[in-house]
């Protein structure tokens, strides 16, 4: 894989190791600008090869990127092939330590921090030429580890065949995650030191933790030490059993003292030798509450039948008298009502004791009209409405007679002044109902 920049200054060796500083081992920069340029070039190389490795493995996202390497303690080994131009980068190998939960040969889950192969890729044009084994051997020598002590992350078929061919790794230990481990993984010195003290005992029953039952000793635990620890924990957990007093000692003690002592005892500590029913009766006797049995309910009188709801009561006469008085008051009010009081309207009689509702001017719509003005502008039998043609929605032309003429011809006599004329308006200015006759153009409401 050739790049646009010259790779020879970056690769002083055939295989270089790169950590989270994104600078190859053995690289020296004369100035800060040179170091920044080298970091940018190494980042471009890692991102490009990581994308090719993901495509070869059928992954949607690359496993190896420069950003992931900067935020971790993993290592990347890059293989370089010099030429007359910028040089070629032909392979990549990413390794690092991870904390894993894996199954051992006995099926027990253990937590180990083991070296892992996270990404391994050689360009297709350079495969089957021994470059992959050269890169892998260089990594084993640098990390000082054995092939069987490695955990492989999502190995492809080619990688599994590569390990079988060159290192004889055939027998795999089944795991529940994406890592593959081989026999000999737990027997190595490095992984064995990480396993100590972190072995997990998984049982099918969950009551062992709640009942303080101890798990059986594992294969790596000494039986004598387990028995000593088991006996010591029982000595610490089990409380001392209370000693029972002889009946001769209790005969000389008064009953009041015994009952007081029983009340002060904790129920959890005295549950082995104190009868709960006897203690319950003592508590009721102390507080003065006695238990009532079913035989004591015989003296309770039986409930009598409900009285007749329709029986006569003297209060009914008072209600009838009040209703009759209210009806009489309503009749007198209707007879004494004057036509001048517009605010008072006739209301229907109420059969019950409720008072009639009084309607005000606000309810009737005559809020802005006085008594005289309301009668003057209210349409009466003397007013005629004449609309000879359609003048639009809501427009009504009112033609009122001139003087005392009540004929149809007087409406078109040539006088356009429209007025309201009532009887006796020339002399007494009073209508036949006793109201003042006001012209519509004299009223401020018009």
UniProtKB/Swiss-Prot annotation:
GO terms for biological process: neuron development; regulation of microtubule cytoskeleton organization. Its EC number is 2.3.1.108. Residues 204-215 have a biased composition (Low complexity). GO terms for cellular component: microtubule. Belongs to the acetyltransferase ATAT1 family. Specifically acetylates 'Lys-40' in alpha-tubulin on the lumenal side of microtubules. Promotes microtubule destabilization and accelerates microtubule dynamics; this activity may be independent of acetylation activity. Acetylates alpha-tubulin with a slow enzymatic rate, due to a catalytic site that is not optimized for acetyl transfer. Enters the microtubule through each end and diffuses quickly throughout the lumen of microtubules. This is Alpha-tubulin N-acetyltransferase. It comes from Culex quinquefasciatus (Southern house mosquito).
């Amino acid at each position: 894989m050739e790049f646009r920049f010259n790779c020879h200054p970056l690769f002083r060796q055939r295989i270089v190791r790169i950590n989270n500083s994104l600078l190859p081992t053995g690289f020296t920069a004369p100035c800060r600008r040179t170091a920044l340029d080298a970091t940018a070039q190494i980042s471009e190389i890692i991102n490009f090869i990581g994308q090719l490795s993901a495509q070869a493995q059928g992954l949607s996202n690359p496993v190896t990127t420069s950003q992931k390497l900067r935020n971790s303690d993993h290592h990347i080994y890059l293989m370089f092939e010099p030429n007359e131009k910028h040089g070629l980068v032909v392979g990549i190998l990413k390794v690092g330590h991870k904390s894993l939960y894996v199954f051992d040969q006995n099926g027990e889950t253990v937590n180990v921090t083991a070296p892992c192969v996270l990404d391994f890729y050689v360009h297709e044009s350079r495969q089957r030429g021994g470059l992959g084994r050269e890169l892998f051997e260089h990594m084993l020598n640098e990390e000082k580890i054995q092939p069987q002590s490695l955990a492989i992350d999502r190995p492809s078929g080619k990688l599994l065949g590569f390990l079988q061919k060159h290192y004889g790794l055939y027998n795999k230990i089944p795991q529940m995650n994406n890592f593959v481990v081989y026999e000999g993984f737990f027997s190595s010195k490095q992984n064995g030191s990480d396993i100590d003290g972190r072995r997990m005992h998984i049982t099918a029953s969950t009551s062992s933790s709640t009942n303080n039952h101890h798990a059986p000793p594992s294969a790596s635990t000494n039986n004598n030490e387990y028995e000593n620890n088991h006996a010591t924990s029982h000595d610490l957990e089990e409380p001392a059993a209370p000693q029972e007093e002889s009946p001769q000692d209790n005969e000389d003690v008064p009953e009041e003292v015994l009952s007081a002592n029983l009340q002060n005892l904790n129920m959890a500590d005295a549950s082995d030798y104190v009868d709960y029913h006897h203690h319950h009766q003592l508590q009721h006797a102390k507080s003065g509450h006695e238990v009532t049995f079913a035989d004591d309910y015989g003296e309770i009188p039986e409930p009598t039948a409900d009285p007749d709801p329709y029986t006569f009561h003297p209060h009914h006469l008072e209600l009838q008298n009040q209703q009759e008085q209210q009806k009489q008051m309503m009749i007198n009010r209707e007879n004494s009502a004057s036509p001048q009081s517009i605010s008072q309207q006739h209301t229907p009689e109420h059969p019950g004791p409720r008072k009639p509702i009084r309607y005000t001017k606000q309810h009737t719509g005559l809020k802005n009209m006085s008594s005289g003005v309301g009668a003057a502008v209210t349409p009466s039998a003397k007013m005629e409405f004449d609309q000879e043609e359609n003048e639009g929605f809501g427009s009504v032309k009112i033609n009122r007679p001139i003087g005392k003429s009540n004929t149809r011809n007087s409406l078109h006599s040539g006088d356009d002044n429209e007025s309201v004329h009532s009887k006796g308006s020339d002399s007494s200015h009073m209508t036949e109902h006793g109201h003042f006759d006001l012209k519509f153009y004299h009223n401020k409401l018009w």
